[in-house]
Amino acid sequence: LKPFVLPKGDRLLAENLSTVIVYGALTAFGVLTGSAGEAAPLPGAILFVLAAALGVVNVGMEYVEAALPILKRNGSLPRLRPASIYKGTFSPVKFLSIIAAAAAEELVFRQFMIGGILNALHAPLWLAVLLSSFFYALNHVYFGRFAVLQKMTSGLVFSLLYVCSGGSVAVSALCHICQNLFLYFYSLDRGKPAAQRKEAAS
C-alpha cells in the first residue's frame, strides 16, 4: 500500500487538514471535560438563510477594510484578491476540506472558547464574544498583520451569530463555510491559464 501523500505545494489542503486534526482534538477535549458546554438545538430556517447571506457580506466587509487605505493612497479601488492558497482548479477534496476546516474552527472558537469562557471563567458574554473573535483573528496572522483586523470583523459576525442562535454552532459554521467557499469559487478562474479564462468568458 502506498502512503497517503498530499500533492506537493498544496497549501490549502495541508492547512485545512491540520486545522481539522488539531481543532478536532481540542473540541473533543472540550466536550469530554464539559468545558465547552452542551450543543444547542438547531434554530429556525431564517437564521440559516441569514448566516449564508452574511458569509458573502463578510467577504465584502473584509474587502472594504483592505480597499479603503489603497483607495486613499492610489485613488482607485483594487480588485478582490483572495489568498493565494485558494487558487487552482476545482477539487472535490479541497471543497470538502474547506467545509471541514471552517466547521472545525467554529467548534473551537465559538463552541469551545465561548462556552469555556462562560462556563469555566464565568466571564460576561460580551467578553467571551470579544476574546473569541480576537483569538480567531490572531489565528490568521500568517496572512499578514492587516488580515488580523479583517478577521476580527468576521470573527465578531460569527460570534454574534452563535450567540443570537442560542449557542448553535451550526449557524456560525454555515456563515464561515459560505464565506470560504465564495472565496474558493471566486478564485478558481484565477488559477487557470489566461487562454482558458478568455475561452470561458466567450
Q: What function would you assign to each model-found segment?
A:
Residues 5-7, 31-101, 114-120, 193-202:
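Juxtamembrane helix-loop-helix connectors linking adjacent transmembrane helices
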Residues 21-22, 29, 64, 68, ...:
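A ubiquitous, low-specificity "background" feature that marks scattered single residues
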Residues 22, 26, 53-62, 158, ...:
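Alpha-helical transmembrane segments of multipass membrane proteins
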Residues 86-202:
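Transmembrane helix-loop-helix hairpins at the membrane interface
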